[in-house]
């Protein structure tokens, strides 16, 4: 099951913008071979969609729950589904916050 390909969608709430969160996620996801994207949302949250091995996605979820220093994660909503294969790489999408 750990090698099973899956998709993780997550919304991270709290003090998560302006603290380098997106670039931490980008570096981590790229290092462990995930594809997808991360972006800031207008409501102050951070949204992430990622695909890859389930075990690596669980590692990403753990990172999302902790956040970088300077952040304060209060809640992570997440869901699992089958991988679609639609992403070629992991990227930071233009968000609605200009702080990082």
Pin down the residues of each PLM region.
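Intrinsically disordered, low-complexity, mixed-charge
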Residues: 1-100
């Amino acid at each position: 099951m750990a090698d099973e390909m899956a998709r993780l969608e997550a919304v991270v709430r709290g003090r998560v913008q302006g603290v380098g969160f997106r670039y931490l996620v980008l570096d981590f996801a790229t290092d462990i071979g995930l594809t997808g994207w991360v972006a800031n949302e207008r409501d102050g949250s951070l949204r992430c969609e990622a695909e890859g091995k389930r075990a690596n996605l669980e590692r990403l979820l753990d990172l999302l729950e902790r956040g970088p220093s300077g952040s304060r994660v209060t809640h992570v909503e997440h869901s699992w589904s089958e991988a679609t294969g639609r992403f070629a790489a992991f990227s930071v999408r233009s968000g609605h916050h200009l702080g990082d």
